[in-house]
Amino acid sequence: MGWSVNRPTGLTYHRAGLSTKGYTLFTPHGDQKTYLIGMDGQIVHTWMFDHIRPGYGRLLKNGHLLMTGSDINLKFPEPPGQGKSPPPFEERVKMLGGYHTTLLEVDWDGNKIAEYDNRFQHHDFFRRENGNTIVPVWVELSDEMTKKVRGGYKEYRERLPNLIGDEIIEVNADFEEVDRIRIWELMDPVKDPISRDVKRWEWTHVNGIDVNERGDIVFSARHNDRVAIIDAETHDIRWKYTKTHGQHNPTWVGDGNIQIFDNGHAGSRVIEVNPENDEVVWEFHGSPYPQFFSGHISGASRIPGGNVLVCEGTSGRLFEVTRNKEIVWEWINPFVNMTRGNPTTSIYRAHRYSPDHPALAGRDLDPERYGNLNRLNNLDTPAS
């Protein structure tokens, strides 16, 4: 779905009586800043990055920001021409969506606390209560495994490389590896083929992870249209869901249910699935269906109280929806940036934090501190 370049931006709609108070964190693609906005859509805090291109972040309870990013001096290789050999694995990963080189932790004022460099990490992360961090990483598969994997397509006269697969690693506070789960060993090369609209460069493309209190990991494998749960004790897959397309951001909600942003073919939806019986117990989609659509990136997070914050990533549209499927808050990204030579307003994901969240305790969240920035982007204009 397209949108007008003259569309309104900033806060476009708000029903204060039905929305959930809080502050929303997001990072526009191509920007050098991460932003925190209030319910009136105005910026109340920013973090500036000078040595990475920031990707996606989360606030920790101590007020630190944990952020993915890429080396600001990173050079992206050109795609190989017809009949040309593909670049080596370490260069090929730079061409993939969600690629990062860095996981950076900064304090409230942007001072570096810790930095983890791994040239094969991508997309997402999860910080455990014990301080360990879980991240997906890309690995190159063997000739034998590449031949076993079904599906996908190749372009005319394209020389295909070995497939890229996924592993999930856990590192401690000193960034020493303490665990590794090989997704490519858990998936079935025949029963979990590459989707037919995906090029045969990657098998799984893990783009989202979440961990419950027991330690079970739920992950999304976008290129297979799969969401799966890895058992904490056995490291085996104990549940697999196959009724989405190009999905993102699976999260644990409620009593063990899984919430998923299902990107879809011509319209997107947010669903809550019961893993015990695969029943979709809640669903939100556009009306008409194509009114809500993001073909890639995007996410949805459950807010305390039951509402859901949705990030329609491609368009840079954030909105809050109730359990009765009513949109009660909407904010559209006014920041236009350049990503790989193209203008964009997209946002990978967003999170809402309640006013009493520990990370916000004692913080100055007065939007007047950013008065000029808010006025410059018309963020100080109330929604009609």
PLM segments and residue spans:
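Histidine-/acidic-rich catalytic cores in large beta-rich domains
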Residues: 1-384
